[in-house]
Amino acid sequence: LRAQQQERLQRELDSAISFLEFTRQRTDTVLRASLREQVDVAMQMVQAIHARESQRHPPEVVKRLIIEALRPVRFYQGRGYYFIDDMQGRFILLPTAPQLEGRLLPDNQDDRGHMIMRGLVEAARLPDGQGFSSYRWYLPDKPNEMADKLAYVRYFAPFDWLIGAGDYTAPWEQQQQQAVLERLRAVRFGQSGVITVADHDGRLLMSSGR
């Protein structure tokens, strides 16, 4: 009987760990799909403005119309926004730091030495659907601290621009963690079998017994 209990416990634990690993891997997939969707919406807007306005206005006016159309847009509970850079590494639109707009900064780095702008420019040269770049960027509520971020960009040929959006990976991981805990909370096996989850510091995160 004891051996059967141990085998059942091992099976349940293996199943829970497999679900955790599946969800962890899915987090990146979900974020990538969402970023692509956001940028595709922006590109439709940009292409429509360009097609309509370039017939009656000079390029500089059309650029300004596009920039100001994207500037106020927010998503991901206010964290997400659209940005535009040119392919030489100049900030064209950066709603969180408009003082940088117009500045040529091809060598800007994150706190781990990654070349942010160069990574975005390289990503913009990839085929549609592949233009992802990972880097670290300043947190909205902690302007002197950086955190991991993923961006997706597309190339806009008429102005030699890249247009993109990104988000910090931590909120997406936390969202998936909560989904995992809710799923495991409902698990019951045998007459009194429950699953308990704790963090590295021993704090109880969830027990399906309560």
Where are these regions (language model features)?
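Juxtamembrane extracytoplasmic/periplasmic/luminal helical "stalk" adjacent to the first N-terminal
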Residues: L1-E60, E68-G80, L150, Q178, ...
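Extracytoplasmic/periplasmic sensor domains and loops in membrane signaling proteins
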Residues: R56-P72, A97-P140, E173, Q177-R183, ...
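Extracellular/periplasmic catalytic domains that process cell-envelope and extracellular macromolecules
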Residues: R74-Q77, I84, L126-P127, M146, ...
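A short beta-strand signature within small-molecule sensing/ligand-binding domains used
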Residues: G80, M117, N144-R154
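Conserved hydrophobic beta-strand signature of PAS-family and PAS-like sensory domains
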Residues: Y82, R90-I92, I195, G202-L205
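Conserved beta-strands of PAS-like sensory domains
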Residues: A147-A179
